[in-house]
Design a protein with these regions (language model features):
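Glycine-rich beta-alpha loop elements in corrinoid/cobalamin-binding modules
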Residues: 1-15
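Radical SAM [4Fe-4S] cluster-binding motif and immediate context
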Residues: 17-172
């Protein structure tokens, strides 16, 4: 027999692949400048100041291409055209899957519909090291990527375990 608690916890992260399609018909899309979807949760990095790994874990958990395409289709069928923010904490946490499956599927889907969405997301600065990934993102319709750059000072980055920006010229 169970009893009510103040806080409920789990040892497992939620399975993002079981997330249902949003019910876009419940909102008045005319009142929004952008819609949001999520492809992944979690981040492979361990920056001291960031709570993402505490909330969502180190291993990026992702939706599959069919889920992403179903979400795009649902938005499209509801009449949405315009900004679409992919709200992942680090969209490029699983680069291999993005390049092999997700981005090619988005490119094909978007091309058939004359690119109805202008995509934006958040990514780690190491996106700049992957020309192929950047080109695929552009082809998919990404026009903006928010990149968190805390400081160009390597000592400060080292103090907070932010190793992704070390030995990188962020000032130039």
């Amino acid at each position: 027999k169970g009893c009510a608690r103040h806080i409920y916890t789990s040892n497992e992260q939620p399975d993002i692949s079981k997330t249902p399609l949003p019910l876009w018909s419940l909102i008045d899309m005319k009142k929004y400048s952008s819609m949001n979807i999520q492809y992944s949760r979690g981040c492979p990095f361990n920056c001291e100041f960031c709570d993402i790994v505490v909330l969502n874990g180190h291993k990026p958990r992702t939706k599959d291409k069919d889920q992403i395409l179903a979400e795009l289709k649902a938005l499209y069928n509801e009449g949405w055209r315009g900004g679409l923010f992919i709200v992942d904490d680090n969209f490029i946490g699983n680069k291999r899957k993005l390049k092999a499956e997700i981005l090619p599927a988005i490119i094909e889907w978007s091309k058939k519909r004359k690119y109805p969405f202008t995509l934006a997301t958040e990514a780690s600065v190491n996106l700049a090291d992957d020309e192929e990934l950047m080109q695929l993102m552009v082809k998919a319709g990404f026009s903006r990527v928010f990149v968190g750059i805390e400081t160009p000072n390597e000592k400060s980055l080292d103090e907070c375990n932010k190793f992704t920006n070390i030995s990188r010229d962020l000032v130039a």
